[in-house]
């Protein structure tokens, strides 16, 4: 059983691994990304898919994707304040709701009939 795996949604996130969430400057007001990061939801979706393929090939009985949503890291149309890029969530926090990201759709494609 894999209890937690995931990736953020920006170019270079796979190389940072669990440190992907550290790209936010929380001392800024309002908080902002700490560099010129580029949103790429396919990075996150591809990583999850690749890992699930490995887990399946190795006979892993189950795996928990980290995580569904991170409300403290909301999406913004302004790339400097799109904290969702630093989120491991498969959906983005938008206002009081959420919207699916490419990773959500990939998981749905794989497991939607189960």
Predicted regions and their residues:
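Low-complexity, flexible helical/coil segments
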Residues: 1-11, 35-47, 98-105
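Glycoside hydrolase catalytic-domain groove-lining segments
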Residues: 1-33, 49-61, 70, 112
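Glycan-binding loop/region signatures in secreted carbohydrate-active enzymes
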Residues: 11-43, 81-96
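Aromatic-rich peripheral "rim/lid" segments of glycoside hydrolase catalytic domains that contact
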Residues: 45-46, 54-58, 66-114
């Amino acid at each position: 059983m894999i209890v937690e795996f995931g990736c953020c949604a920006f170019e270079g996130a796979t190389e940072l691994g669990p440190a992907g969430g550290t790209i936010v400057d929380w001392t800024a007001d309002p908080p902002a990304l700490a560099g010129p990061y580029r949103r790429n939801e396919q990075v996150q979706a591809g990583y999850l898919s690749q890992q699930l393929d490995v887990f399946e090939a190795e006979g892993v009985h189950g795996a928990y994707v980290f995580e569904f949503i991170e409300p403290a890291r909301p999406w913004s149309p302004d790339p400097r304040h799109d904290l969702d890029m630093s989120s491991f969530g498969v959906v983005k926090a938008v206002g009081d709701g959420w919207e699916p990201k490419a990773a959500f759709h990939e998981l749905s494609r794989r497991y939607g009939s189960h």
